[in-house]
């Protein structure tokens, strides 16, 4: 569960929210865009996540598992399947339900989700690169001469 203004600690698949299942996220720290992005609940999940603000903290009424594709760098694709009721109910997830690590929840009181990727497997971490060591041409030549 994340609340308004929180930064997502991992890549999370959205299950429900205080805002009729959907939410807005701010990704300016990731891609520089100032516009809020809308994320929507998968159709049909609302019946499983009938949560109110009053009973949110102790909610544990849904049992199932989420299968997701192998971690990849593409920020604009995501595929996953949520299995509920012992696998008899399946719900497909896409990029419209993915809350990226490092993004912030905005204009939505709370969201509930299932962690899809953590640590080095998050899309942002897969896209991060180590900084290059920068040196001038002259410094490189001097280093070679010092070695000989």
Which residues are covered by each model-predicted region?
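Conserved cytosolic headpiece of P-type ATPases
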Residues: 1-148
């Amino acid at each position: 569960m994340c609340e308004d203004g929180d930064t997502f600690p991992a890549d999370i698949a959205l299950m429900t929210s205080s805002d009729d299942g959907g939410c807005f996220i701010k990704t300016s720290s990731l891609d520089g865009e100032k516009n809020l992005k809308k994320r929507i609940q998968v159709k049909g999940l609302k019946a499983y996540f009938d949560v109110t603000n009053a009973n949110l903290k102790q909610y544990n009424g849904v049992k199932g598992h989420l299968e997701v594709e192998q971690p990849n760098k593409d920020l604009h694709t995501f595929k996953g399947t949520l299995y509920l009721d012992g696998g008899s109910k399946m719900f497909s997830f896409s990029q419209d339900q993915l809350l990226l690590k490092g993004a912030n929840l905005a204009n939505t009181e709370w969201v509930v989700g299932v962690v899809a990727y953590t640590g080095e497997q998050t899309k942002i971490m897969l896209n991060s690169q180590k900084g290059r060591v920068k040196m001038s041409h002259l410094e490189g030549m001097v280093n070679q001469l010092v070695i000989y």
